[in-house]
Curated annotation (Swiss-Prot):
Specifically methylates position 2 of adenine 2503 in 23S rRNA and position 2 of adenine 37 in tRNAs. m2A2503 modification seems to play a crucial role in the proofreading step occurring at the peptidyl transferase center and thus would serve to optimize ribosomal fidelity. The lineage of its organism: Bacteria, Pseudomonadati, Thermodesulfobacteriota, Desulfovibrionia, Desulfovibrionales. Its EC number is 2.1.1.192. The keyword Membrane does not apply. One of its GO terms (molecular function) is rRNA (adenine(2503)-C2-)-methyltransferase activity. S-adenosyl-L-methionine binds at G169, E170, S201, S223, L224, H225, N299. This is Dual-specificity RNA methyltransferase RlmN. Keywords: 4Fe-4S, Cytoplasm, Disulfide bond, Iron, Iron-sulfur, Metal-binding, Methyltransferase, rRNA processing, S-adenosyl-L-methionine, Transferase, tRNA processing. Residues 102-337 form the Radical SAM core domain. Disulfide bonds join C109-C342. PROSITE patterns: RADICAL_SAM. Its main location: cytoplasm. Belongs to the radical SAM superfamily. RlmN family. Reaction proceeds by a ping-pong mechanism involving intermediate methylation of a conserved cysteine residue.
Length: 364
């Protein structure tokens, strides 16, 4: 059986014509039902003939992730633990904010791998190890779950406004499925997200950077977190295989649109990378590119190997960057009361023994 959510539009068109003997326009109808109307069954596709729906049901399935756990923070952040068809667990987070007009808008943080191979020592997902890549259908299934949860089926005026590939996994190590996902996200007859509303975050893997940039399908964010190679080796051991100097050199020629900048994510770890000497090194790196900095304050949980930086060090770090004409914004952490950081909810479920593969999952 073909999981139809794993097909690009071109693949769906070929499936409909070759496998079902349908005219090409039928693929467009099915495609819009899948991605714009969030259909979970072929029976919902009321402008498709019953005979065609029956043939679709014989040869294809629509597989959404099942919702295992939902947690909502006092600040409105909502975290989902999702079970995939093979029992694997991934997380996605909905982060609310208000527009300038005061209307609600949601940013969704997406996972692209089950686990992660990068082994970053400050990240809960990094301690779990890597299981497998997610498919396009599994990646985009997170968006379908979010839209269903929000009652958001209005492509002309959606509540779900922005998508960030900053959940579990390294996008550039699953480049093929991530790129397939981005094309469907950008498709005006698909999920219809503007590239300006999508950000792909990488630990700094050079391979795939240029392909992502030349595609124009999303903005780029780089999880930097270290001002020099020595600290990078210590806190991001796998990412350190790609030297910082080589990464910055690659970013110097990264294709950017007018007024577009690379966003550098920098997690402030108390006593590790939050000193003025680190800020000086950071300026030397970032000033080589058209970049800006998001400063993230580490929020330790019990048993974590790092401490939060003091307010004084945070302020001094930020002010030094601004004094050197580096745009630096302290990003507010949300969902701290529900373990909204990457991998924390899955880790807590595993510790309780409720997330074993193959366990029964409730309906979404």
């Amino acid at each position: 059986m073909t999981d139809i959510l794993n097909l690009t539009y071109e693949e769906l068109e070929a499936f409909m014509t070759a496998e079902l003997g349908e005219p090409r326009f039928r693929a467009r109808q099915v495609w819009q039902w899948l991605w714009q109307k969030c259909a979970r069954s072929f029976d919902e596709m009321t402008n498709v003939s019953k005979a065609t729906r029956a043939r679709l049901a014989e040869k294809a399935v629509i597989t959404w992730p099942e919702v295992e756990t939902v947690q909502k923070s006092a600040d409105g952040t909502t975290k989902f633990l999702l079970r995939l068809a093979d029992g694997a667990l991934v997380e996605t987070v909905l982060i609310p904010s208000a527009s300038r007009e005061g209307t609600l808008r949601i940013t969704q943080c997406l996972s692209c791998q089950v686990g992660c191979a990068m082994g970053c020592t400050f990240c809960s997902t990094g301690t779990m190890g890597f299981e497998r890549n997610m498919t396009m259908g599994e990646i985009l299934g997170q968006v379908l779950v979010a839209r269903a949860h929000l009652g958001d089926s209005r492509p002309d005026h959606p509540i779900l406004r922005n998508l960030v590939f900053m959940g579990m996994g390294e996008p550039l190590l699953n480049l093929n499925e991530v790129m397939r996902s981005l094309r469907t996200l950008n498709d005006e007859f698909g999920l219809s997200f503007s590239p300006r509303r999508i950000t792909v975050s990488t630990c700094g893997i050079e391979k795939g950077l240029r392909e992502l940039g030349e595609s124009g399908l999303a903005f780029l964010a780089v999880s930097l977190h270290a001002p020099n190679q020595e600290i990078r080796k210590r806190i991001m051991p796998k990412a350190a295989h790609w030297h910082l100097d080589d990464l910055i050199t690659a970013l110097e020629s990264y294709p950017l649109k007018t007024r577009e900048r690379v966003t550098f994510e920098y997690l402030l770890l108390g006593g590790v990378n939050d000193g003025i000497e680190h800020a000086r090194e950071l300026v030397r790196l970032v000033s080589r590119t058209k970049g800006k900095l998001n400063l993230i304050v580490y929020n330790p949980a019990e048993g974590d190997p790092y401490d939060a930086p003091t307010p004084e060090r945070i302020l001094a770090f930020e002010q030094y960057l601004w004094s050197k004409n580096i745009t630096a914004i302290i990003r507010k952490s949300k969902g701290q009361d529900i373990k909204a950081a990457c991998g924390q909810l899955k880790a807590s479920e595993l510790q309780r023994g409720t997330a074993s593969a193959g366990a029964d999952a409730p309906e979404a």
